[in-house]
Amino acid sequence: MILGVALVRPSPVLVAVRDGAPEWPVSRVAARAAARACVAVDLGDVPTAAVAAIRVGGPCPEVLRPRVGSGTATIVRGGHSLTGRVLAPLDTEAVRRFAATCGLTDFAVTATGSPMLADHELAVAATIAAEVPQARITLSYEFGHPGLREREQATIRNAALGPEAGRIADEAARELPGMPVFFARSGGGLVSAHYFRRYPLACDLGGTASLARGRVVLPGVPGEVAAAYGAAIGRPEAQVERIVQARGRAELDRVLQDARDEALTRVVSAGALPGSARIAETTVNPLSYLPDGLYRVRVTAEGAMP
């Protein structure tokens, strides 16, 4: 039996799935007999943490500075072009001072050019970790968007969701002791609780995605039931998005293989049985209005449940 859980107010809705057939309502005692639980939740209204945002790049007008709500932000010198050229040396001392004085533990780091070369983001993360050992750090290159503002906002959002995602995962573990728990992704599929804690942004609209999936199979049931069922019938999935530079077909094939290998590793981290991981989709698009040989690559991998 697989347990689908829709986290809705005032209380979660539980659906048991046996051989694809749904059963509800389900008592909490019966729920604990499930082989695994798959949770559907939207994170749009959950509490968010104050974030310390660091942008690595050149100066900009006030209106274009990072937007962090109740948090704080700084811009430090550094960054790369989308072709990997260093725009300026990284100001590590400015990073250290900001980390030491901001008073926060949730950090979002965005460097210009990091989808192509993440060296400065990784160096910033190392500096933060040395200064604030308990820091939770999100790096923008892991999200792959070519646009700085889009990538920066995704990074800040992921960092802001981190503490609440941890609380949700902890609560699920307490309610379902010893049971593997997965969370529904916004784009479909599932991720492990560990992955959910690290990349909650991937599950920002997990409830909505599960509802759409469940409605296809169960069009006449209440929305919460459809969402719980939609989560229960999912499978582990992960996506890698990168900006790559390739001069010629052979080099493009090589960087595509690197992206596929990373996607396969990531889907196993998301909970897939290692031997079952496979590439579900690869898209490659040239970037317009930029030097030849720059591509946006998106690879989706999926796998079976353990």
Task: Provide a role label for each language-model segment.
Residues M1-P306:
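N-terminally biased helix-coil "hinge/interface" segments that flank
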